[in-house]
Amino acid sequence: MNKLRQKYLQKWLRAQQEPIKKLMRANIVLATLSSFILVAQTYFLATLLDKLIMQNVPRDELIPYFLGLIIGFGMRAIILWAREKIGFQSGQLLRNHIRQKILDKIHLVGPATINQKPAGSWASIMLEQVENLHNFYARFLPQQSLSAIVPVVIFIAVFPLNWAAGLILMITAPLVPLFMIIVGIAAADNSQKNMDTLSRLSAQFLDRLRGLETLRLFNRTSEQTEHIENATEDFRETTMDVLKLAFLSSAVLEFFTSISIALMAVYFGFSYLGQIEFGTYNAPLTLFTGFFCLILAPEFYQPLRDLGTYYHDRAAGIGAADAIVDFLESDYLTVHQNEKTISLESAVEISAENLVVLSTQGSALTKPLNFQIPANHNVALVGQSGAGKTSLMNVILGFLPYEGSLKINGQELRESNLADWRKHIAWVGQNPLLLQGTIKENLLLGDVQANDEEINQALMRSQAKEFTDKLGLHHEIKDGGLGISVGQAQRLAIARALLRKGDLLLLDEPTASLDAQSENLVLQALNEASQHQTTLMITHRIEDLKQCDQIFVMQRGEIVQQGKFTELQHEGFFAELLAQRQQDIQ
C-alpha cells in the first residue's frame, strides 16, 4: 500500500467520525482535566515530601496535602472510567455506522454483485475488518489529541520552576514520535496484508465447510485440509510480522523515554551536588523543584508512549479500511431508484425493446432482447448454462442495470420504485433460503397475515403437506436448512411463494431437487397458480413445458426462438436441446 493510499484511507477514517464528535470532544476535555489534576497531585506530593524531609513540619500540618492527594487519585480514577466508557461507546457507534453503510451499499448493488465474492470474504469485511476499526476511534484518535495537550500542560507547569528541566523535555519530546513513525512506517502495509490473508482464510474455510460432504464424496478432504493449513500458516506469518513491529516499536519508545528521564535525573543530581548551577533563575534549587519535575517527567512522555502503542491501532485501522473503502467507493452501476409506483390494478404484463442487461461494472451480459409477456401467461425460459437466463431474471427483479426499454404494465422499470415493485413478486430460486426457526415462521415470510387455512392450502399445492403433517408446523429448522431434506426445503419455498400471492411469479429451477412424482405434482400446482398471475420460469427440464403459454429459447445472450412447445419442438436450437435432454434421460 503506497503512502498516498494510506493518507487517503486515514482521511476517510477521520471523515467518518461525524456521529461521535461530541463524544470525542468529551473524551479530550476529560483527559485534559485529568492532566491538570495530575499536576495538582504532583504539587501536593512534592510539597509534602519537601516539608516532611527538609522543613521538619509537624505531621498534623501535612494532612491537607494527604487529603488533596487522595481526592486527586479518586477524581482521576473516575475520569479514567468515564473516558474508557466514552471510548467504547465511540468505537461501537462508529462500527455500527460503518456496518450500516456497508449494508446500504449491499442493498443498493443487489445479490447479483454480492455473489461475485465468497460469503467468507463478506463475513470478514462485516465482522473482523469493521471490528479492527474500533481502536482507531476509541483509542488512537483521542490519544493523538492528548499527546499534544498533556505535554504542553506539564511543560507550562515545569518551565517556570526550572528552565533547564523544561528545555530537556522540549528537546527530547520530538524523539519519541519521530522514532515511532520510523518504526511504524511498514505497520500499515503489514496490517493490510494481515487483513487480506484473514479474508482469504475466512472465505476458504467457510466454502470448504459448506462443501464438506462433496469433498468427502470425491475423496478430497486431505488435499483441502492441506490448503486450509497453508492459508492458516500464511495468516500466522502475517500476524507475527505485525507483532514483531509492535514489540520493536514498544522497545524503541521505552528506550528513548528512559534516556530522556535519565537526563533529567542526572541534571538534578549534579545540581544538588553543586556541579551544575544553571536553570533555576538564580534561585536556590529546592527538593520540591526536583521532586516536582522528576515526578512529572514520566507523565510528560506517557501520552507519547501511549500514542506509540496506539499507533498500531492506526495501522490496523488503515489496513482494515482498505477493503471497506474499496467496496463502498466502487463505481457499481445500479438501477436508479424512483418514487413512482407501478400500476398493478391489472395483471402484470412485461415488454422489452432492445433490452441489454448490464453487469454492475457496465459490461453487457446479453445482446439486445425483444419480447412480450402478456398478463397471466406462463412463460418458460430455457437455454444452456451461461445463456443469460439468470441475468434476465435479475434485471426484472431490479438487481441489474440495463440499456434499452423494460416496461412493466407500460411503465419503465428504471423510473419505478423498485422496493414497491418487489413486494408484488413471488420468487423461488435453485437453492432457497430457509431461516433458522420453525416451518411456520419460514412460511409466514411470504405473508405475515396468512391464516392456518391459507397455509394448509399452500402446503397442499406445493406437495409439502405430506411431510409437514408428520413434522408439525412448529418443527425447528436449523441454520442452513438443517433438519429437513433439500427436496423438502424446495417444496417449502414453493409453498412460501404461493402464499405470497404475488402478481408476478419468478421461478429459477423450482423442481431441481424433487423426485419425478413430486415434480409433476408441483408443476401442476404452479400451472394452476399461473392462471391467476404472470409466471416466468427458468428450467432445464424442457420436456415438461407443454403446458406453458410461451417458451423463450436463449443462446449466447440472445433470444433465438419464441413460441409454444408444439411450434418449437421440431426445429432450431430448442429441438437440439430437447433431443439432448431426452438422450440424457435415457
From Swiss-Prot:
- Write out the GO biological process terms: cysteine transport; transmembrane transport
Q: For this UniProt entry, which segments traverse the membrane?
A: 28-48, 62-82, 146-166, 167-187, 250-270, 278-298
Q: What is its EC number?
A: 7.4.2.-
Signal peptide (UniProt feature, chain positions): none
Task: Supply the Pfam families for this chain.
Answer: ABC_membrane, ABC_tran
Which positions does UniProt annotate for ATP binding?
G383, Q384, S385, G386, A387, G388, K389, T390
User: According to the UniProt record, what class of enzyme is this?
Assistant: translocase
Report the InterPro entries cross-referenced here: AAA+_ATPase, ABC1_TM_dom, ABC1_TM_sf, ABC_transporter-like_ATP-bd, ABC_transporter-like_CS, ABC_transptr_CydD, P-loop_NTPase, Type_1_exporter
Q: How does it sit in the membrane?
A: Multi-pass membrane protein
Its keywords, alphabetically, are: Amino-acid transport, ATP-binding, Cell inner membrane, Cell membrane, Membrane, Nucleotide-binding, Translocase, Transmembrane, Transmembrane helix, Transport
Q: ABC transmembrane type-1 domain location, by residue?
A: 28-316
A GO CC term attached to the entry: plasma membrane
- CDD domains given in the database record: ABC_6TM_AarD_CydD
Reactions performed catalytically? L-cysteine(in) + ATP + H2O = L-cysteine(out) + ADP + phosphate + H(+); glutathione(in) + ATP + H2O = glutathione(out) + ADP + phosphate + H(+)
GO: which molecular function terms?
ABC-type transporter activity; ATP binding; ATP hydrolysis activity; ATPase-coupled lipid transmembrane transporter activity
Q: Where would I find the ABC transporter domain in this sequence?
A: 350-581
* Physiological role: Part of the ABC transporter complex CydDC that exports the reduced low-molecular-weight thiols cysteine and glutathione to the periplasm. Export of these thiol-containing redox-active molecules may be crucial for redox homeostasis in the periplasm, permitting correct assembly of various respiratory complexes and formation of correct disulfide bonds in periplasmic and secreted proteins. CydD contains transmembrane domains (TMD), which form a pore in the inner membrane, and an ATP-binding domain (NBD), which is responsible for energy generation.
Comment field on protein domains: In CydD the ATP-binding domain (NBD) and the transmembrane domain (TMD) are fused.
Matching entries from PANTHER family are given as: ATP-BINDING CASSETTE SUB-FAMILY B, GLUTATHIONE_L-CYSTEINE TRANSPORT SYSTEM ATP-BINDING_PERMEASE PROTEIN CYDD
Name of protein: Glutathione/L-cysteine transport system ATP-binding/permease protein CydD
What is the native source organism of this protein?
Haemophilus influenzae (strain ATCC 51907 / DSM 11121 / KW20 / Rd)
Taxonomic classification, please? Bacteria, Pseudomonadati, Pseudomonadota, Gammaproteobacteria, Pasteurellales
- State the gene name recorded for this protein: cydD
